[in-house]
UniProtKB/Swiss-Prot annotation:
<keyword id="KW-0800">Toxin</keyword>
<dbReference type="GO" id="GO:0005576">
    <property type="term" value="C:extracellular region"/>
</dbReference>
<protein>
    <recommendedName>
        <fullName>Conotoxin Cal6.31</fullName>
    </recommendedName>
</protein>
<feature type="signal peptide">
    <location>
        <begin position="1"/>
        <end position="24"/>
    </location>
</feature>
<keyword id="KW-0960">Knottin</keyword>
<comment type="similarity">
    <text>Belongs to the conotoxin O1 superfamily.</text>
</comment>
<keyword id="KW-0964">Secreted</keyword>
<comment type="function">
    <text>Probable neurotoxin.</text>
</comment>
<keyword id="KW-0528">Neurotoxin</keyword>
<keyword id="KW-0732">Signal</keyword>
<feature type="disulfide bond">
    <location>
        <begin position="29"/>
        <end position="43"/>
    </location>
</feature>
<feature type="disulfide bond">
    <location>
        <begin position="36"/>
        <end position="47"/>
    </location>
</feature>
<feature type="disulfide bond">
    <location>
        <begin position="42"/>
        <end position="51"/>
    </location>
</feature>
<dbReference type="GO" id="GO:0090729">
    <property type="term" value="F:toxin activity"/>
</dbReference>
<keyword id="KW-1015">Disulfide bond</keyword>
Length: 53
């Protein structure tokens, strides 16, 4: 399951997160409870939250 989780997170990072980087900066990850300095960092946390929960 953990390997699958990592693969899913990687796919999300490559496909969704890069396209959504501008939106991540705009909302500053407040919906996820995180305040990030970089869209990439913000995005990683979003993807892992989706994967874990």
């Amino acid at each position: 399951m953990k390997l699958t989780c990592v693969l899913i997170a990687a796919v999300l990072l490559l496909a969704v997160c890069q396209l959504d980087s501008a939106d991540a900066i705009t909302r500053d990850c407040k919906t996820k409870g995180y305040a990030c300095f970089a869209s990439t960092e913000c995005c990683v946390q979003d993807c892992w939250l989706v994967c874990l929960y």
